[in-house]
Amino acid sequence: MATISPSPDLFTLVNVFGVAPEKQRELRDHLVQVTEDLIRHMPGFVSATFHLSRDGEQVVNYAQWRSEADFRAMHADPRLQPHFDYCRSVSRPKPIFCEVTHSFGATSPEGA
C-alpha cells in the first residue's frame, strides 16, 4: 500500500508524465508491469501508485523509497535502461522530488 506520511526518512518522488491521450493507458500499463516485475523487488522500494489524469494527458506516479541512495541505485540499474528509454520515447517525464510535510485522513467513515 502507498505510504504517505511526513517522515523525513523516506524519499518521495512524484513523476508527472505528459503524454498523448492515445498513449496514456499504454504508458500506465508499461509502468505497472515494470514495477511489478522489477522495481518493487529492489532494495529500498516502499510503494508506488499510478494515476491517470481525466483529460488523458498525464500519467502520475507517486513513489516512495527508503532513501535517495536506494532510488538512485534503481535508476542506475542497467536492466531498467530500456524502460527509461521507452518512457522518454512516448512521454515527457517530469520528476519532482518531494518532502511530505502533512498528510490527513478522514475523521469518520462517512468521509472516506
UniProtKB/Swiss-Prot annotation:
Activity regulation behaviour: Inhibited by p-chloromercuribenzoic acid, N-ethylmaleimide and diethyl pyrocarbonate.
One GO term of the biological process aspect: antibiotic biosynthetic process
ABM domain sequence ranges: 11-100
EC number: 1.13.12.21
One Pfam assignment: ABM
Substrates-to-products reaction catalysed: tetracenomycin F1 + O2 = tetracenomycin D3 + H2O + H(+)
Name this protein carries in UniProt: Tetracenomycin-F1 monooxygenase
Keywords: Antibiotic biosynthesis, Oxidoreductase
Function: Oxygenase required for conversion of tetracenomycin F1 to tetracenomycin D3.
Pathway stated in the Swiss-Prot or TrEMBL entry: Antibiotic biosynthesis; tetracenomycin C biosynthesis
MF terms in GO: oxidoreductase activity
pH dependency: Optimum pH is 7.5.
Coiled coil region boundaries: none
Gene, per the UniProt record: tcmH
Top-level enzyme category: oxidoreductase
Segment forming the signal sequence: none
Subunit structure: Homotrimer.
